[in-house]
Structure formats: structure tokens, C-alpha cells
Regions:
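Conserved class I S-adenosyl-L-methionine
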Residues: 130-152
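Conserved alpha-helix/loop element of class I SAM-dependent methyltransferases that forms part
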Residues: 20-40, 56
Length: 152
């Protein structure tokens, strides 16, 4: 994980310029925000990075408090939102049952221990809380994988 963190810290200044896919998926994930019947007081954007999804969450839920969480300090510095916490997703700095809504865009594939990650998310979520995320699966970008296999 430390190598991933180092890479994100180094890339943060120019990340938005080359993150077309991340932004596109955040747009699609944000479309779900408009049909969710939840009135959250506190939202975590887990793996918020520079804030692609953060901005959309604030627009969808303007009365909520948004907390941007990322383990790459430099990415958080590029994020314009006020409440930012540099933290490990496996050890979120919140009490049990304290968060109404967690959103996360393309962060989970960087976490080798998904069980620990999900356990931690559900620990901080209120019983009626919601976790909305996007991630890559085994068939994601299969055309690109196939192309690389021909080159290799």
C-alpha cells in the first residue's frame, strides 16, 4: 500500500489532467445520488483524492457535512473541500455507527484486504447508513488487457 500511496502523492499535481476514466465513472456514480432517498447529515468520500466525487456529493446533499478521506496527503491538498482527513481506509478515525453515508469512487481495487475494508466501513456506518461505491472487476478494461497480452 505504501508504494500506491507514494505513486498517488507524486501524481497528484497532474492527476486530474489524465484521469478521464475516473471522472467519467464518478459522473455515472453521481447519477445514483439523485435517486437515493436518504437525507445524510454526514458523508465520507472514501478515497476522495482530488475530489471528483466530492463535488457531486455536495451538490446532491447540500445540507450534509462532507469529509474527504484519502491516504495520499498530496491528493488531499489538491482537493478544494474544507474537511479533509489523511487516513488509512482500514482504520477510519470515526466512532462506531457515526456516519450516514459513505461514497467511494474507484478506490477499492487498491485495497488488497477487502474484508477488512468493508468491515471498517460498516463499523462506522449507522445501522440505516448507506455505502455506494464503484470499483473495477475482473472484466473491466478487458479489451485493454487483451491488447497488452498480444504485445507481451
Amino acid at each position: 500500500m505504501s508504494r500506491v500511496r507514494t505513486t498517488f502523492n507524486k501524481a497528484s499535481a497532474k492527476y486530474d489532467d489524465s484521469a478521464f476514466l475516473q471522472n467519467e465513472i464518478s459522473v455515472r456514480l453521481a447519477e445514483k445520488l439523485n435517486v437515493i432517498s436518504i437525507d445524510p447529515k454526514t458523508i465520507i468520500d472514501l478515497g476522495s483524492g482530488t475530489g471528483f466525487l466530492s463535488e457531486k456529493a455536495v451538490k446532491a446533499f447540500p445540507k450534509a457535512t462532507l469529509i474527504c478521506i484519502d491516504f495520499a496527503q498530496q491528493s488531499l491538498l489538491s482537493n478544494v473541500h474544507d474537511l479533509k482527513v489523511c487516513a488509512n481506509a482500514y482504520q477510519l478515525p470515526f466512532t462506531d455507527n457515526s456516519i450516514d453515508f459513505i461514497v467511494s469512487n474507484l478506490m477499492m481495487q487498491w485495497c488488497p484486504d477487502l474484508k477488512t475494508l468493508l468491515d471498517e466501513c460498516f463499523r462506522v456506518l449507522k445501522p440505516e447508513g448507506l455505502f455506494l461505491f464503484s470499483t473495477f472487476g475482473p472484466d473491466t478494461l478487458k479489451e485493454l488487457k487483451r491488447s497488452w497480452s498480444v504485445v507481451d
